Amino acid sequence: MSEDVVKPASGRRQVARAVALSGVWLALRPRIGAAQAAADTLLNVRQFGAKGDAKSEDTRAIQSAVDAAATRGGAVFLPPGVYRSGELQMRPHVSLTGIPAWDYEHGFGSVIRLADARARCLLNITGAFGATIDGLSLDGAKLGAGVHGVWLNKPDYGKQEDTFRIERCQIANFSGDGVRLTRAWCFSIRHSMIAYNAGDGISLRGWDGFFLDNWFSGNHGAGFAAREENASCTFTGNRIEWNREGILIVGGDGYNITGNFFDRAGTCGLAILGGQQISITGNFIKRSGKNAKPGEYDSSQIRLERTRGVTCSANNLQAGRDDNGSGVWSPSYGIVYKELQHCVIGNNVLHDGALQQLMVDLGGHGEGAVVKDNPGCLSPQPKGSA
């Protein structure tokens, strides 16, 4: 694939090719005007000296391109290559766009690889209102300690919505969280893979987020965790798999968790502690509790404690072991619940749903706690299995 530099004086064919690669189309303008507009607002990082050869230090070149795009309401295009970089500061209303070609385990296409173990993060989106990160593989290279992939860190919520977008990206191998959001509101993360990070896949303090069609895979913390104030998030069509914890929500409200696949969490597949006004519907939750001690409540598919106004229905729960037929069978329990008020746990199916007990009632409920019609059976284990 050509890595030609896109310059304002380039011919229309070259500019049009760069435009097509970045997924940006200019329509309803004269052809010459469209080409010139693309050259002015679609900036190729090679134009600013980036090499993308997996050897050179490209931090200054990429940052210069982002800063230039911010002055003209433009976008920055990274042709396929491996760009070694330290911390980059995104700017408001700038799109950082590449070609997504990553696979399940590795980054390909347009890759930005962390080159500074002392960095706080790779992409800092603090204050970058309306920014877009699209089609990139962000590789932490397992450098440093507590280095995040994408980081938003505000002292307060401010008066303006963040409205950033992360699309078609792989964010992997960071020594901190894949995405760390502190006081974020109004944003979306879609069609991405957030995997193999030493912390959480996504750590959220904030609200008004959309998480659609993502993989949260193999993170050493939770696939998704919200441990401080959090609210009003939608999870649809995600796969949350092989993380130390699946989804952990502490004290949140206003969640819609629908149509997701939870697989092989180290502890609970889905834990909601102190939450309210949450809908949990139509999810498949499979073989949770891989690393939990058998008989402890962390060895469960779903755990609901101190919840109000929660609906948990039409979910399918199944026990199991590792893909290759080895490893421990888990979990011990299907749904563990306590201190419910105005909640419904009903019409879930637990065929082969757990090893010891399908439904565990720890009591302490207030009024309006309805738990009924959750059919199923314990999972048989082959004799001599681990």
Spans of features found by a protein language model:
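N-terminal secretory signal peptides
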Residues: 1-10
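C-terminal segment of N-terminal export signals and the immediately downstream linker at the start
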Residues: 9, 29-48
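Sec-dependent signal peptide hydrophobic core
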Residues: 19-23
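Acidic Gly/Asp/Thr-rich repetitive segments characteristic of extracellular carbohydrate-active
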Residues: 45-77
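Extracellular beta-strand-rich solenoid/capping regions of secreted or surface-exposed proteins
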Residues: 62-71, 83-97, 104-134, 139-162, ...
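Short glycine/acidic-rich loop motifs that flank beta-strands on beta-rich extracellular proteins
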Residues: 85-87, 106-108, 116-121, 141-148, ...
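Parallel beta-helix/beta-solenoid
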Residues: 91-92, 118, 128, 133, ...
